[in-house]
């Protein structure tokens, strides 16, 4: 097989595998969240459908596919229909620059478990993940529903504000590595736990994690779908599979940021003691994902004014201080 043919086949297989695996994990994420919340609230959670209730995911999928796809009478039809697609597709496109595993060989060809190893990986990731806000924005505006409009406005407010914190928190890491490639950042941390950026840049780790909660619409930092105030926010007027696509995008974003935090701050897929790198990245990402679920059960929502104060008066100045201190140390 020629190199060009192998490259084309490899790229197609990677795209299909990433799409199918992440979509499956997003479904499992809904099950995991329900079981974790149930455990923390001393409930059983899903248990009737399949062993330990694991087939509840299939039952929910059948329900979403068979429910009527309604639309408000005053909604903009075209924009209303494409908004969930934008939210879900942006979450999956952002994964194209993420190295999920260490490279390995097949039939003498080196396979790198990344769809596109561009030298601006972090910039691409932040740009595409930031585009997800358009799906939420136009979905709420096009639904002709007051809860949807308010939810979309609050979504834009929080996402645009914390996009700045998201980017600034990564600048010290980029300055120390000298590259925007996620693979280069992982290789910079291959000298044990002391080389992890969690140790070198702990403040940036906290800031980026806070911004990740905002990007994924996770409690306690979510203004988009606060049930006690906005019903379901921008998704109030949606039903069926289009409603489900918003949540597929949300859980896909959670998986993406769990992996990205593991790659940038927790050593990525570098092996640790006797644990191989492929298992290490899975364990680290699973811990971050569980942390996102745990905070929903443990912490209440912040008010919009509290969230904006956290962004502009606390996170932003701290991020700038980290940049200046890192620059001073490097120079």
Swiss-Prot record:
Keyword Signal (UniProt): no
Keywords noted in UniProt: Cell inner membrane, Cell membrane, Membrane, NAD, Quinone, Translocase, Transmembrane, Transmembrane helix, Ubiquinone
Membrane disposition: Multi-pass membrane protein
GO terms for cellular component: plasma membrane
Keyword NAD: yes
Annotated Pfam families: NADHdh (PF00146)
GO terms (BP aspect): aerobic respiration
Membrane-spanning intervals of the chain: 6-26, 45-65, 78-98, 120-140, 167-187, 193-213, 241-261, 263-283, 311-331
EC number: 7.1.1.-
Subcellular location: Cell inner membrane
GO function terms (MF aspect): NADH dehydrogenase activity; oxidoreductase activity, acting on NAD(P)H, quinone or similar compound as acceptor; quinone binding
Reaction catalysed by this enzyme: a quinone + NADH + 5 H(+)(in) = a quinol + NAD(+) + 4 H(+)(out)
EC main group: translocase
Family the entry assigns: Belongs to the complex I subunit 1 family.
Biological role stated in the UniProt entry: NDH-1 shuttles electrons from NADH, via FMN and iron-sulfur (Fe-S) centers, to quinones in the respiratory chain. The immediate electron acceptor for the enzyme in this species is believed to be ubiquinone. Couples the redox reaction to proton translocation (for every two electrons transferred, four hydrogen ions are translocated across the cytoplasmic membrane), and thus conserves the redox energy in a proton gradient. This subunit may bind ubiquinone.
Complexes and interactors: NDH-1 is composed of 14 different subunits. Subunits NuoA, H, J, K, L, M, N constitute the membrane sector of the complex.
Protein known as: NADH-quinone oxidoreductase subunit H
Species this chain originates from: Campylobacter hominis (strain ATCC BAA-381 / DSM 21671 / CCUG 45161 / LMG 19568 / NCTC 13146 / CH001A)
Classification of source organism: Bacteria, Pseudomonadati, Campylobacterota, Epsilonproteobacteria, Campylobacterales
